[in-house]
Amino acid sequence: FNFPVAVWNWNSALAWICGDTCVWKASEKAPLCAIACQNIWNEVANENNLPEGISCIINGDYRVGELITKDERISLVSATGSTRMGRIVGAEVAKRFGKSLLELGGNNAIIITPEADLDVTIIGALFGAVGTCGQRCTSTRRLIIHEKIYEEVKNKLSSAYKQLKIGNPLDEKNHVGPLIDKDAVNTYLKAIEKAVSEGGNVLVEGGVLTGEGFESGCYVKPVIIEAENYYEIVQDETFAPILYLMKYSEIEEAIDMQNGVKQGLSS
């Protein structure tokens, strides 16, 4: 749901170039994007005298998705979403000896060395953590900071978070928009609770915003938590604006921490 048009575009365009047709099952959380793109495709197809059926859409929840994963006429399934979803899709498609392309979760970190330009680093870490309200597989989840500069980074970042403006993402003055739905909000709240129960120290408090402009109940405050890399909650991706801070002393230790999670990494 976070990049609904882009995900469709980079998958379907390649398939068309190779002479294949596509059936697109959009996220049930962003179905109108699929309809809008299909309308554009229909115009292009009509202008170029292309037959119907090259691009098709179906909308619905996971039960509709199961129709695709189990259909032996569909030789390749490309799926973007959670790691949990990927395990199900990959196994189901493999049962019929089909092929799957899976773009799943990420648990990305930034390693901050003593030589780093902290002003540039803070901007990058801030955008990486709160951009799209933390709802990207490429979002920054962890900051691995050298012990010599840990306090300085912590203080500068906490100060920067206090300047964030939360609201309608169509307003260019705002930095952070909403989470996708109430389920995502509950996951966000449970993640904070879990981090604290494991020993985490909350530096920048979270919470759900209320009042004018926040009637949906999906606008939340970005959070910073001091944590350890081995915490269960840190080891698993949370699709929300929660950033974990941790220390290192030697670069080899930092690299081990960076790689020491189950999900993939972006750079």
Predicted features, each with a name:
Residues V7, Y231-Q235:
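Cytochrome P450 core scaffold surrounding the K-helix E-X-X-R motif
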Residues P241:
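Glycine-rich nucleotide-phosphate-binding loops and adjacent flexible coil segments
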Residues C33-C37, R136, E237, M257:
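Short acidic/histidine- and often glycine-rich active-site loop of Leloir-type glycosyltransferases
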Residues E43, R84-N229, K247, I251-E252, ...:
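ALDH superfamily catalytic-core signature
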Residues F1-V120, Y248:
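Rossmann-like NAD(P) dinucleotide-binding subdomain of oxidoreductase/dehydrogenase enzymes
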Residues E66-E72, Q235-E237, D256:
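Short acidic alpha-helix that forms the nucleotide-activated donor recognition element
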